[in-house]
Every structure is written in structure tokens, then in C-alpha cells.
Amino acid sequence: MKLRDIIDSPCGLRYVIDSLPLASGYSLRYLMDTEALTAQEDIAAAYSRMREHLSAAGDGNLVSMLHSILCSLKDISHTLSRIEAGNTVDDIELFEVKALILLGRRVSAVLEKASQASIAPHTGDLEDALKVLDPDGTEIASFYIYDSYSPELAALRADIRREADADCRTDLMDREQALEAGIREELCRTLRPSVPALRKLQEELARLDIDLAKAVQMLRMRLCIPEISTSGVTSYKGMYNPYVKEVVERAGGEFTPIDLSFGDGPVVIIGANMGGKTVVLKTAALCQWLFCFGMGIPAEEALIAPRERVFFISGDAQDMGAGLSSFAAEMKAIDGVVRASAEAQDGSRIAAMIDEPARSTNPIEGTALVEALVDILGQREVALLLTTHYNIPSSHCTRLRVRGMEDGKMNYRLCPAPEGDVPHEALNVAESLNISPEWTGKAKKLLEYE
């Protein structure tokens, strides 16, 4: 699974990625094509790199300087492939190769001067390639077929400058072009062995841009570096959703951070609409995916277990293109989790966050479907986090609920929900929205609240 495959998942992932202060568009494309990390050692290495970049990220002047250099990083993979295949490229493409080497040298020099050599790209293998493209040693970011490449070419150009006759000049210029073509061919032949090192440099520069952006984002947004869980349990202290937090604070409100733990048996969150259940689910999915790509986690503290597959099923899953209703599309999506867990050698390597499954069907069948789902995935040790309106027995899961209305304000923190504890928050929420007292009052009488 690549980042681009899940970027538009409705959990706030795009907001976090769009907030990365990347210098280069190529770096963003490189990041989008990155595969999710599933092995503990790979995830540990990713966060080790982030720690290495934190010192540089805290130096505003250094970050600005690197940003101004890395913004010119381009993807020249096509040019490198052409050279590797034995093709002769033009002057613009040769300039791109030279510019890449010079860019790498500039970045390395800046980092070494700032005592950050440990994160600098390696350009030592490309000294010979630079000499080929910069025979005069000017280190200027430009390229043409220099006189230095051929005494014959230099003499011919001098003749062209002196020649007054137009026809003679044309003949001389034709000879010049033929000589230049031969030199380009030889340059490409000479550069061919350096293509692997050039590719490596391009990727190192993109990774530097990405890792530095991750570290800067972590400091700016006060994210945390998670601990890696080896027990299968994932837990968060002070977890929040950056996108929702910004929206709430922009409206003058205050976002409530959440403490959450799951992975040791299914966890079911019950409660009314507007109770924050879906936000908890979305934030848990967001954190798991950020973890898969070695990014800062929006929480005070985080302990996260690596997963091979992550499922997030939320909202209206209606697939009009496939001719499916909301219920049918939702059932097919959830069935994908059930089948994946059946095929997996270790169900604990799967995480599933499912928002109010079977909510669009009748309560009797809906309760049966959800209870069966929790039982099946629980037996297979899937790390299941599920929200529902239905009253699911605690024998199948750990039940949590949103605290709800307290002193006229909504408390979104989670607390245990004992067996038979069905939260009655719908009318409280309705009253907080100034819904017609006639309506809510009659509903209370019907429920014998009064």
C-alpha cells in the first residue's frame, strides 16, 4: 500500500500531508509513492532518521537555507534512464544532470558547515561525473558544449566568429554541430556508469527534504515520536485530530484530547451522534497510518503496534458506480476485513476501525450483525476498534462510551461502559442545540424520562 492509495481517506490524512513543509514537488511525489512500513525494524529506522533531523529542524536559518536549495530539486529519472539505455541526450538534459550534482554538493556543504554532516547526501562518487560536465571547474549551474572538450571545436568556433561570408559560415556551423553531436554522444557514454550514483543522490535529496519536513512539522504541531509496541496493544495519551482541532479552535472552541487503548481484544465505543465517537475512530486510523509512514503522531504519548494491513471504514460507503446501496457497499467493505482475517496467519497484524456498521438497517438485525462481527474478529485477534449505537454485550469486547453532557457541556473523553449501560445522550444533545422543547419534551414523556 502506497501513501497515494489512502491519502483521501476521510480521517484527516491529507490535511497532515498538505501541512508538511516540503521544498520540492518531486519530494511530494516521491513521498506519495512510498510504501507503508509494516516491519518493526523498518519503522524503528524511520523514526531514528526523524530523531537525527530534529536538531537541524530546530535551526530556522538552516531550514530556510536548505529549503531555498532543495526547491530546485527535480525528477530527472527519464533523463537518467535514457543515458543508461545508451541514448544521447540534449544539452538541457545534460544541464539537469550537472545541476543535480551541484545541488547535492551545496546541500552537503551547508549541512557540514552547520555540524549536521550525518544527514548530508553523499556526492563523493560523482566527482568524475562533475568533471565531465564541468571541464573548466566553474561549478556554475549552466551547461553547453564547452570549447574545452575539443581543440578542434574551439578552433572551428574561432573561425566562425571571423568568417564574414554567409555561405562559408553556414558550412562551418554545420561542421560545428556535427562535432558537438559527437561530443554529446561521448559525454553520455562516459556518464553511463554514474547513473546508479545519480539516482541514489536524487533519492537521498528527496528523502532529506521529506525527513526534514517531518521533523519541522513535528516541532511546529507538537507531535510525538511513538514507542513501538511489541505486545500488539496500541495506546494513546492526549490523542487529537489536527484537522478537527484546527476547525474547533477556529470557531472559538476547545478540542478535547482523548486517551485510548486497544489491540488486546475488540473495543466498542457506544454513544449518541455528536458524541465524538467518529472523531476518535478517525483519529486512531490517522495515527496508525502516520505511524506506517514514519511521521509524528498527534498525541502527548503514543505506543503503537505495527500492522500489516489497516482497514478504516467510515461514513456513507455508497458506491453508485457499482450500483450498490449504502448498506450493500458497507457490507462488502466490512466483508473484506472478515475475509482478510480468515486468510491471515496472524490476525493481530490486522487493524480495523469500523464506524457504526449496519447503522442503516433495523436495530434487531443490525445488533446481530455487529455482535457477530465483533465475535469473529475478536476470535481472530484482529485489533478492532468499532463504534455503534447498538448495545453489544461486554462478553465479546471492551465497552467504552463518551462521557457525554456534564454541566451543560459535552465531555468527549472516554470511560468504561458496563454491561447494560446504554447512554441516553440524544435528547441532551438535542436540547444543547436548542431544538424545539415541544418536540424533545414529548420524546422524554414517551421514554418516561420524567
Task: Show the residue positions of the predicted features.
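Conserved amphipathic alpha-helical "coupling/scaffold" segments
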Residues: M1-Y149
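A general alpha-helix detector
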Residues: R49, D75, T79, E186-L187, ...
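Charged/polar positions within long, soluble alpha-helices
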Residues: S55, H78-A85, R106-Q116, K131, ...
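Glycine- and acidic
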Residues: G58-D59, L187-R192, V267-G271
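Active-site phosphate-binding and catalytic loops of NTP-dependent enzymes
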Residues: E84, A213-L223, F291-E300
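Extended, charged alpha-helical coiled-coil/arm scaffolds that mediate oligomerization and mechanical coupling
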Residues: G124-D209
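Charged, amphipathic alpha-helical linker segments immediately N-terminal to NTP-binding catalytic cores
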Residues: K200-K245
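ATPase nucleotide-binding head domains, primarily ABC-like/P-loop NTPase cores
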Residues: S229-E450
